[in-house]
Amino acid sequence: MTGAGRGLGRAHAIELGRHGALVVVNDLGVALDGSPGDETSGHSPAEEVVAEITAAGGCAVANHDDVADFEGARRIIDTALHEFERLDAVVNNAGVVRDRMFVNAGEDEWDTVIRVHLRGHFCVSRLAAEYWRDLAKRTGEGAGGRIVNTSSGAGLLGSVGQAAYSAAKAGIVGLTLVQAAELARYGVTANAIAPSARTRMTETVFAAAMAAPGQPGEFDAMAPGNVSPLVAWLCSTDSAGVTGRVFEIDGGRLTVMDGWQRAGTSDIGRRYGIEEIGETVTELIGRSPDPLPVYGTS
């Protein structure tokens, strides 16, 4: 469980521990933008989550490796195999943000966001997939592995001021589809979630939407823990028949996203002349549904 020291990752790790999972709680303990954290408790966020899981009767160990460093990712996988002698699921959740309007975006900011989100998903999943492939070949049976990736509404629809984040999260959807197609032969599933919840990433950008309810007993739709039962189910044997899917979840609403679908199509059976393109595009758009709006636009 990567990025498990706070927010969604913390909630997922605790939920998994509650259901008997042996959890590797990975977190670097950094600030929201990826800079060094300022923890003063003497314990890292990962260690605090481990303590919470074990206090509730679960089993967990902390790991502080960088998900986007290939050898660091290898140590994350090795931690599970050394401590628990098995690897059943990988939940990729670690991320950072460097919000900036596209025209002002810096090269280093872009690289940092893409590195942690997209490369981080690649590194950990790639090494897990290698383990499961070898296990399936050795035993002659499906490995039963589970990959749960974390995309976002920004990756599905785009989000103003978050070009790098949106691009990374869209890339994660593409990665998930390929993982599902390629790893099915080894009995491994891959799915992605696009959650909306109150975290360090969202409560500053979408403060009003993420606010906790004002009345006691009112359903807190944006509580991170609302997302975690979906993650736990996707990690379980019950989800064996579900792969290559993206699930949007916020509060009590769960949606299967339909992905890119062909809308209007025109095939004239020959090369288009340039004068025909504009007329055809106008006609196709006219009979295609309007796209959902980008986050941050009216």
List each model region and its residues:
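Substrate-binding pocket helix/loop in short-chain dehydrogenase/reductase
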Residues: 101-102, 109-114
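Residue(s) in the substrate-gating loop at a strand-loop-helix junction
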Residues: 152
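A glycine-rich helix->loop->beta "capping" turn
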Residues: 56-59, 71, 78-92, 98, ...
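The beta1-alpha1 cofactor-binding region of Rossmann-like NAD(H)/NADP(H)-dependent oxidoreductases
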Residues: 43-47, 64-75, 107
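C-terminal helical subdomain
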Residues: 192, 213-298
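Canonical Rossmann dinucleotide-binding motif of NAD(H)/NADP(H)-dependent dehydrogenases/reductases
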Residues: 1-25
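Active-site helix of classical SDR
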Residues: 125, 168, 176
